[in-house]
Amino acid sequence: MTPAPVPGRPDTAATLAELRAGLSERIGVPVLVENDAAAAALGEFWSRRVPREQAFGCVYLSTGVGAGFVFGGALFRGASSGAGELGHLSIRYDGRPCPCGNLGCVEQYASTSATVRAAREHPELRARLPLDGTGSSAYDAVARAAVNGDPVAYAVLDQAAEHLSRAATSMANLLDLGRLVLTGPGVALAGSIYARRLRGHLSRTAHSRQRHSVTVELSAQPRDAAGIGAAVLVVQASVAPGHTPGVAG
């Protein structure tokens, strides 16, 4: 499968509808389509038995940066199922250009792809880490070195975590979240670095800090979170179809 269309393109909904219909016709069963961050949020919400009344959010770190939200026990999708594009929140008005058309998107600074690019700018890291492989293997090499005490690798990852924490704090402020889970392949090896940064930033700047804390947790299965959420979607479609739009078949 090809990546999802760039945020903001008008053909996104039509592309997903065609994908659902085509797959359903080909395999002969109903088909659900959901983005990875939203699916991960739903899976984390169900597996953690979060109270329905709690405003729950999930940050999904991979080659992009996404978010998912569960309010009142239901996944929040927005007007066109495009809610949660955290990666395209600008943190620098004159920053790096993004394919979405904006400047300074957090995805250009905090995604696993951005972290690998930053690591490759350090000759000492290129000399001792396998950074010429695939994006995922190169990122894992940086993350592993960071948690094992490499100061340069740690600095690169910590800077990415700082960028992500600023965007995630803005998200928590905007939605008055009570719990936030970090998940996705990007936190599988070095989640503690991201969690420490986010907890510190929330404790200093979250608007709700005098009323309630924002609990930050790490996913128990960050690499599989989206797949687990997809399974939850299937279960939810059978027991609460009103919360699962876009079923083809």
What do these predicted ranges mean?
Residues 1-117, 229, 235-249:
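Phosphate-binding/catalytic loop of phosphoryl-transfer enzymes
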